């Protein structure tokens, strides 16, 4: 093949040190099956390859023009289009979370103005979530006045004129919601739980045409009451957040500060871990489990229903076909099977579209980079529609918005399905 007896010692592919988070990568590509942006922009493997080339060019001083071009293009192809969900780590032989690395890069690129804005939002979260809910209600009112097609045209025009700075509107966009009060509900109940409605649940309600118009907080409280629970809430709940929105944008210090505030409030409400804590949003719960003390017994909806409510509720299957979406955090928590099991207790037929991992909504990317969301759900649409599913269920409001947008059926929290299929189980009381 070659006359050079030392050819096997030459022309090795260079793998320059780049960052400890990704330096172990052997570029095998096993991550790509779980990467939602694969074949859309860059895969997790390709992000690492580009970052290594950037590191090499910086180290050698070669080709400054190429370096500048790579750094510029990586902002959109590498950073902005990365969902940051961490599913790549599940199939990586050495557990590399490229999403974590991208979040670190986002943090490195934050301006002083962005830091100031991030801190301001964190310090005024109650007002921010209230303003978000009011804005959503205003848009919903416009929707009622002008109709779907007219509002879609208006949204498309506004988005184009703003150069995509204004989020995309679809009929699946929710109305505003509000936080429940902090007074204990059903204080004489034989069991107690601390319920923390996420900031998303406190600001985003159902869509205009969803079959149930109660908020996720109202539905969750109803299910807990049916099961005989006294419901406690953390103090000053409206200003609390797990920190996930800041973490995803690279504001690591702010994210940790908000997590610490929430942890302190949950410890007080749960009497130092005496009572379980339920959070209605899976991505929030995932972060809480990773950063908070083990004293807290933390649960997302599916796991809480399975562990605490089965003995206190009577389930009646509805004669319908429903779809479910396992969020990235549900998959990382190993709860996909449990989601299907709980849904199967409530509906005769449950559809979990194969070959769908991250939906691509990724926090706010479904609003600001909707084509990533469309790409992430491209294999789900026909499966859900051909199965004749009448509704879909998950455990993250933003993911549900994306799923509803592209499948054409309403998506809601799994707690809505549990509520519809259950009654108090009197014989167990």
Roles of regions detected by a PLM:
Residues 2-14, 38-74, 95-121, 409-419:
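Non-heme iron-sulfur electron-transfer modules
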Residues 1-33, 39-56, 152-179:
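Flexible inter-domain linker/hinge segments
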Residues 17-20, 33-36, 73, 83-90, ...:
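Glycine- and acidic
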Residues 18-39, 74-96, 329, 356-357:
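Cysteine-centered iron-sulfur cluster-binding motifs in ferredoxin-type domains/subunits
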Residues 10-23, 67-70, 76-79, 227-231, ...:
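Short, intrinsically disordered, charge-biased short linear motifs at domain edges
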Residues 6-7, 16-17, 63-64, 73-74, ...:
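A short, structure-level motif marking secondary-structure boundaries and short turns
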Residues 99-429:
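Iron-sulfur cluster-binding electron-transfer modules in prokaryotic oxidoreductases
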């Amino acid at each position: 093949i070659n006359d050079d007896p030392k050819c096997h010692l030459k022309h090795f592919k260079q793998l320059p040190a780049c960052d400890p988070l990704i330096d172990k990568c052997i570029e095998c590509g096993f991550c790509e099956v779980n990467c939602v942006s694969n074949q859309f922009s860059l895969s997790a493997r390709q992000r690492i390859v580009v970052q290594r080339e950037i590191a090499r060019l910086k180290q050698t001083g070669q080709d400054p023009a190429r370096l500048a071009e790579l750094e510029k293009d990586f902002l959109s192809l590498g950073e902005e289009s990365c969902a940051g969900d961490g599913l790549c780590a599940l199939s990586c032989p050495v557990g590399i979370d490229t999403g974590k690395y991208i979040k670190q890069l986002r943090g490195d690129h934050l301006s002083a103005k962005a830091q100031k804005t991030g801190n301001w939002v964190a310090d005024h979260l109650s007002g921010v979530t209230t303003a978000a809910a009011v804005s959503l209600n205003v848009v919903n009112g416009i929707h009622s006045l002008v109709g779907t097609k007219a509002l879609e045209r208006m949204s498309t025009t506004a988005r184009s004129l703003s150069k995509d700075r204004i989020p995309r509107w679809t009929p699946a966009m929710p109305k505003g919601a509000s936080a429940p009060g902090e007074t204990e509900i059903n204080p004489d109940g034989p069991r107690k739980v601390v319920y923390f409605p996420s900031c998303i649940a406190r600001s985003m309600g159902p869509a205009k045409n969803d079959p149930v118009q109660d908020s996720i907080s109202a539905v969750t409280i109803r299910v807990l009451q049916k099961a005989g629970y006294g419901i406690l809430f953390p103090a000053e709940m409206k200003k609390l957040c797990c920190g996930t929105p800041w973490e995803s944008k690279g504001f690591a210090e702010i994210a940790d500060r908000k997590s610490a505030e929430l942890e302190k409030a949950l410890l007080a409400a749960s009497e130092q871990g005496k009572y379980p804590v339920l959070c209605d949003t899976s991505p929030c719960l995932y972060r809480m489990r990773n950063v908070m003390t083990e004293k807290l017994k933390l649960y997302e909806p599916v796991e809480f229903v399975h562990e605490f409510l089965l003995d206190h509720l009577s389930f009646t299957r509805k004669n319908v076909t429903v779809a479910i979406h396992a969020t990235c955090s549900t998959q990382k928590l190993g709860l996909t099977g449990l989601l299907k099991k709980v849904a199967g207790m409530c509906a005769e037929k449950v559809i979990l579209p194969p070959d769908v991992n991250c939906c691509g909504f990724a926090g706010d990317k479904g609003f600001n980079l909707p084509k990533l969301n469309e790409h992430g759900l491209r294999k789900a649409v026909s499966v859900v529609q051909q199965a004749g599913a009448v509704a879909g269920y998950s455990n993250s409001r933003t993911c549900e918005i994306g799923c509803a947008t592209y499948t054409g059926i309403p998506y809601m929290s799994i707690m809505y399905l549990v509520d519809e299929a259950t009654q108090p189980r009197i014989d167990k009381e």
